Amino acid sequence: MTVLHVQEIRDMTPAEREAELDDLKTELLNARAVQAAGGAPENPGRIKELRKAIARIKTIQGEEGDLQENE
């Protein structure tokens, strides 16, 4: 999985953004589980990259009004 750039995220539909967000959250959860278990992650910088990508998607969702009120 590559880094998501802002323009790529803006070009996605709201449903695609939501699906990508779910995928990134799952990947982050797995990476943190490996780290918590004491294992060496394949790419140590990946956790930071995932967090930033999630933040970018959420920011754009907020700007474009995609966010639901309960989030």
UniProtKB/Swiss-Prot annotation:
PROSITE patterns in the record: RIBOSOMAL_L29
InterPro entries documented for this protein: Ribosomal_protein_uL29, Ribosomal_uL29, Ribosomal_uL29_CS, Ribosomal_uL29_sf
Highest taxon of source: Archaea
CDD domains: Ribosomal_L29_HIP
GO CC annotation: cytosolic large ribosomal subunit
One GO biological process term: translation
Keywords assigned by UniProt, alphabetized: Ribonucleoprotein, Ribosomal protein, RNA-binding, rRNA-binding
Pfam families associated with the record: Ribosomal_L29
Single GO MF descriptor: structural constituent of ribosome
Subunit structure and binding partners: Part of the 50S ribosomal subunit. Interacts with protein L23.
Role, per record: Stabilizes the tertiary rRNA structure within the 23S rRNA domain (domain I) to which it binds. Located at the polypeptide exit tunnel on the outside of the subunit.
Family named by the database record: Belongs to the universal ribosomal protein uL29 family.
Protein name: Large ribosomal subunit protein uL29
Organism: Haloarcula marismortui (strain ATCC 43049 / DSM 3752 / JCM 8966 / VKM B-1809)
Lineage, highest ranks first: Archaea, Methanobacteriati, Methanobacteriota, Stenosarchaea group, Halobacteria
Gene: rpl29
